Amino acid sequence: MSWIDKFFITFFYTKVGEDEFLNQYYESRNNIDYLGRSRRCVIYKNINESTKIPPSWYSWLHHLVNEIPKNVQLFPWQQNNKITKKLPKTSNLKYNRWQP
């Protein structure tokens, strides 16, 4: 994206939010598309790579949802203490192998 595109986006659009990759999302103030919806765009942090958009922001960009996504903090990893030490028996004692 050229610097002039970034200038016009920041001038004519309102900033809606940022994701964890520091991409900035904008929505137009008064420019609407042919379906009557406001235009939405993204300014990428580093290179213009569409795979760097999280699924929640992707659905917002393509008008699948109208709610602005929130950054959800994930919990840190914890060890599962509910795992039993003794494994259940897998052999069935009632089973007799067939012998011809």
Curated annotation (Swiss-Prot):
<dbReference type="GO" id="GO:0006979">
    <property type="term" value="P:response to oxidative stress"/>
</dbReference>
<dbReference type="InterPro" id="IPR007763">
    <property type="entry name" value="NDUFA12"/>
</dbReference>
<protein>
    <recommendedName>
        <fullName>Uncharacterized protein RP725</fullName>
    </recommendedName>
</protein>
<dbReference type="GO" id="GO:0045271">
    <property type="term" value="C:respiratory chain complex I"/>
</dbReference>
<dbReference type="Pfam" id="PF05071">
    <property type="entry name" value="NDUFA12"/>
</dbReference>
